[in-house]
Regions:
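Alpha-helical scaffold elements adjacent to nucleotide-binding pockets in ATP/GTP-utilizing enzyme cores
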Residues: 41-45, 56-59, 136-140, 167-178, ...
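Conserved Switch II/interswitch segment of TRAFAC-class P-loop GTPases
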Residues: 103-136, 142-169
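P-loop NTPase switch module centered on the Walker A-proximal segment
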Residues: 6-8, 18-108, 113-116, 120
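Short coil/turn segments at secondary-structure boundaries
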Residues: 127-129, 164, 205-207, 368, ...
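C-terminal effector/interaction modules appended to NTPase cores
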Residues: 1-28, 33-36, 87, 100-101, ...
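Conserved nucleotide-binding/hydrolysis micro-motifs of P-loop NTPases
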Residues: 51, 119-123, 155-160, 197-201, ...
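Residue-level signature of catalytic and energy-coupling elements of molecular machines
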Residues: 35, 41, 60, 86-88, ...
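Canonical P-loop GTPase G-domain recognition
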Residues: 147, 158-237, 241-243
Length: 450
C-alpha cells in the first residue's frame, strides 16, 4: 500500500496502551440453526457473569410463564422486541456485554464464533441438512474472519440425549469434516464443548460427574478465557469502520477499532467524504462510566465527534488517521469463491448483487471475469461464465465511493461477501485497488499535514 504502515513511535503507542483497559476485548457471534439455543445460552452467560441482575431475570421468567414458554426466560434477555418475545424467536442481532477477570466480551460480530448445535434427536439433523442454517452460518462466519470456533453441543440434558457420549461423538463425527472443508483448522482452532444452556451445566461450572462421567474437558467459559486472538495491530494506522451513528448532545459514531489507537482529543478523517473531525470523547460501553482516554484494536467504541453534523457520517464510513488514510474506490479486483447458485444457472459479467464489506453494504456489478481458478490453482483467462462453487479473479464496480483495503494489508477490511435475493452467493477478498483511488485521499492527507 502507498501509505506508511505505522503511526507514532513504538514508545508512544506503548504509552497509550498502558492507559487502555488491559483486558482483551473479544467479540463473540452466536450462530446455528433456529431453536438450537443461541439466545438461551447468551442469556445464561450474561446471568452467570452478573451482567444481568436478578430483577431482570425474574421479570422475564414471569413474562415467559404468562406465555407458556417457561423454559425460554433466558432467551428473553436477548430478545429485544415485544414481537420477538411473543414468537420466541430472536430476529434482531442482540448486543450485550459481559466480563470475566481476564477478558471483556461483546455478543455481536466477531473474533470468535460459538456454533450452537442442538443434541436433541432430529434437531441436529434438521439443522445440518442442506436447507438448515448450520452449514451456511459456519461458512459465513469463516468468510467474515471468524478463525476460532467453539462448537457448543447444547441440550445434552434433554430426555432423548441424557448426556450420552455416543450422541456427542456422532455430532462431532458428522460436523468436523464439513468444518475442515469450510477452511477451519479443526486441530488448532475448533473446540468442542457439551453443555445445557437452560441449566447452565458446563457453561461456567463443570457438569457434575453424576450427570456426565465421560467429559473431562474445560467449561465453555474456560475455553473462551484461554483463546488466543491474533492479528490486531496497535502500531498500525487507525481504522474504525462505522457501524452506526446517532445524536446525543452531539454526533456519536459506533464502531470497532480494527487497527491503531483511538485517542481522545485527536483529529480524525472520515472516509469517503474526507472531512476532518475531533474526537471529543471515547466510550467502550454505553454509560458514562465507560469513558476512556484511549481505545485499542478490538474495542467496540462510541466516539463523540466535534466538527461534523449528522449528515456527514453514516454506516459504512471509516474513521482514520488523517495522515495515514485508507484508499477510497468505486472499482477493485477480487478473488471470488462462489457458493451454491441455486437461484441462477450461471455467474457472468454483468451480475449485480449487494456487496458487504466491513460495515458497508453497497450495490455492485461484476464488470469482468478475468480468470477462472481451477482446483489445481491453474488459471483459465477470460471465462464466459462460472457455475456453483467455482473460483475466479474478477473486476467489481460499486455505485458509491467506499473506503477499503487490500486483503494482504488488512484482512478484516479487505474481505467481503456478495448477497443476492437474501442469500450469500460468494465470498471474496480484495486483491487490487486502482492507484488513482489513493490519489484523492493522499492529497487530503498532504493538505492536513501542512
Amino acid at each position: 500500500t502507498p501509505f506508511p504502515e505505522g503511526v507514532g513511535t513504538r514508545e508512544e503507542v506503548d504509552e497509550l496502551l498502558a492507559k487502555a483497559d488491559s483486558r482483551d476485548h473479544l467479540n463473540v457471534v452466536f450462530i446455528g440453526h433456529v431453536d438450537a439455543g443461541k439466545s438461551t445460552l447468551s442469556g445464561q452467560m450474561l446471568f452467570l457473569t452478573g451482567s444481568v441482575d436478578e430483577r431482570t431475570i425474574e421479570k422475564f421468567s414471569r413474562e415467559a410463564k404468562q406465555r407458556n414458554r417457561e423454559s425460554w426466560f433466558l432467551a428473553f434477555i436477548m430478545d429485544t422486541s415485544e414481537e420477538e418475545r411473543a414468537k420466541g424467536k430472536t430476529v434482531e442481532v442482540g448486543r450485550a456485554e459481559f466480563s470475566t477477570e481476564t477478558r471483556r466480551f461483546t455478543i455481536l460480530d466477531a473474533d470468535v464464533g460459538v456454533l450452537v448445535i442442538s443434541a436433541r434427536k432430529g434437531e441436529f439433523e434438521a439443522g445440518f441438512d442442506r436447507s438448515g442454517q448450520t452449514r451456511e452460518h459456519a461458512l459465513l462466519a469463516k468468510t467474515l474472519g471468524v478463525r476460532l470456533l467453539i462448537v457448543v453441543v447444547n441440550k445434552m440434558d434433554e430426555e432423548t440425549v441424557q448426556w450420552k457420549e455416543e450422541r456427542f461423538d456422532e455430532i462431532k463425527g458428522k460436523l468436523e469434516p464439513f468444518l475442515k472443508r469450510s477452511g477451519y483448522n479443526t486441530k488448532k482452532n475448533v473446540h468442542w464443548v457439551p453443555i445445557s444452556a437452560i441449566s447452565g451445566a458446563n457453561v461456567k461450572e463443570a457438569v457434575s460427574p453424576e450427570e456426565c462421567s465421560w467429559y473431562k474437558g474445560p467449561t465453555l467459559f474456560e475455553v473462551m478465557n484461554t483463546l488466543k486472538v491474533g492479528g490486531r495491530n496497535p502500531y498500525g494506522p487507525l481504522r474504525v469502520p462505522v457501524l452506526d451513528r446517532y445524536n446525543e448532545r452531539g454526533v456519536i459514531a459506533m464502531g470497532k477499532v480494527e487497527s491503531g489507537m483511538l485517542v481522545q482529543g485527536s483529529k480524525v478523517m472520515l472516509l469517503p467524504v474526507l472531512n476532518i473531525a475531533t474526537v471529543e470523547e471515547v466510550r467502550i460501553g454505553e454509560s458514562e462510566a465507560d469513558v476512556v482516554e484511549v481505545a485499542r484494536p478490538g474495542d467496540n467504541v462510541f466516539i463523540k465527534l466535534k466538527g461534523v453534523g449528522d449528515e456527514d457520517i453514516m454506516k459504512g464510513f471509516m474513521i482514520v488517521d488523517p495522515a495515514h488514510p485508507a484508499p477510497v474506490a468505486t472499482r477493485f479486483q477480487a478473488q471470488l469463491q462462489l457458493l451454491d447458485l441455486d437461484h441462477r444457472a450461471v455467474f457472468t459479467a454483468g451480475y449485480s448483487a449487494v456487496l458487504h464489506l466491513h460495515t458497508a453494504a453497497e450495490e455492485c456489478t461484476v464488470d469482468k471475469l478475468v480468470a477462472l481458478i481451477g482446483k489445481d490453482g491453474k488459471q483459465v483467462k477470460n471465462p464466459r461464465f462460472l457455475k456453483s462453487n467455482q473460483a475466479c479473479i474478477c473486476n467489481i464496480s460499486l455505485t458509491q465511493n467506499t473506503p477499503m483495503e487490500k486483503f494482504s494489508a488488512f484482512q478484516q477490511l479487505g474481505r467481503f461477501t456478495l448477497r443476492d435475493e437474501g442469500r450469500t452467493i460468494a465470498i471474496g477478498k480484495i486483491t487490487g485497488i486502482p492507484a488513482a483511488s489513493y490519489a484523492a485521499v493522499e492529497e487530503a492527507a498532504r493538505k492536513y499535514g501542512k
